[in-house]
A protein has these predicted regions:
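NTP-dependent small-molecule kinase module
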Residues: 2-5, 88-94, 162-171, 190, ...
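Hydrophobic anchor at the beta1->P-loop junction of P-loop NTPases
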Residues: 16
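Conserved glycine(s) of the Walker
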Residues: 23
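Hydrophobic positions on the alpha1 helix immediately C-terminal to the Walker A/P-loop
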Residues: 27
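Small-molecule kinase domains that catalyze NTP-dependent phosphoryl transfer to phosphate-bearing small molecules
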Residues: 78, 123-129, 139-142, 146, ...
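ATP-dependent NMP and nucleoside kinases share a basic, alpha-helical "lid"
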Residues: 94-171
Length: 244
């Protein structure tokens, strides 16, 4: 693991947003590892609540009941320090929350205003005291609007579907691949039109298009953006009255 630690005062809160399968989780985790930051994929919180709602047969039509599941969900660090393990009532359900049933239901659950509000303070607390890359769909616009650096990873829906198809080792001409493309299009529509915290790039975000990029190229672009922002922060004069 590379550990080129930046000075404490220059360690940033980085908001990394993007649509489904844009690479924000894998890219964000790799970039965070390179710069010695923590990493948090906030989408895991919504997936965990969705999995629990399915297991308990709690419908999205009952928002207060869904909101009541939040306290049972926890993110824990993995062996690399990333907040990437999902604990529900103390039991590891990391693999369960990535299943196809959750894929299908997570948009409807995530759109519940009461749930988004309930998770807001928790996500903000995770970002303290800095030195973190936080990935999601509304980090730079809602969760951390004052983040030191905002990045939005973008890619065409066809490119994102191709990646997910490859990840699952599916026939790109098969029915399952077509279903993935249709599901991503549906998720994009739901995420970008929901009433609360719709998917969009922050006005001050750096937009990185990943169409045709190698994974390593996108990671390097994010790392370079973080390093540039750290350098600018380190060069800022100390506030008047600060001790020498």
């Amino acid at each position: 693991m590379e550990d080129p630690q930046a000075p404490t005062q220059a360690r940033l809160v980085v908001a990394l947003d993007g649509p489904g399968s844009s690479g924000k989780s894998s890219v964000g985790a790799a970039a965070a590892l390179k710069v010695g930051y923590r990493f948090c994929d906030t989408g895991l919180l919504y997936r965990a609540v969705t999995w629990l709602a399915l297991a308990r047969k709690v419908s999205a039509s009952y928002p207060h009941a869904v909101r009541g599941l939040v306290d049972e969900v926890e993110l824990a660090p993995d062996e690399q320090g990333r907040l990437a393990r999902v604990l529900i009532d103390g039991v590891d359900h990391t693999e369960d929350v990535r299943g196809p049933a959750v894929d299908e239901a997570v948009s409807a659950i995530s759109a519940i205003p009461e749930l988004r509000l309930a998770l807001l303070d928790r996500q903000r607390a995770l970002a303290t005291p800095g030195g973190i890359v936080m990935a999601g769909r509304d980090i730079g616009t809602v969760v951390l609007p004052d983040a030191d650096l905002k990045i939005f990873l973008d890619a065409s829906v066809e490119e994102r579907a191709r990646r997910r198809t490859n990840e699952r080792d599916l026939d790109p001409a098969g029915a399952e691949a077509a279903a993935i493309l249709a599901a991503l299009r549906k998720r994009d529509e739901l995420d970008s039109t929901r009433a609360v915290a719709p998917l969009r790039a922050a006005t001050d975000a750096r937009i990185i298009s990943t169409d045709g990029n190698r994974f390593e190229d996108t990671v390097d672009a994010v790392v370079n953006a973080i390093r540039d922002a750290e350098a600018r922060r380190a060069a800022e004069p100390e506030p008047s009255g600060a001790s020498a």
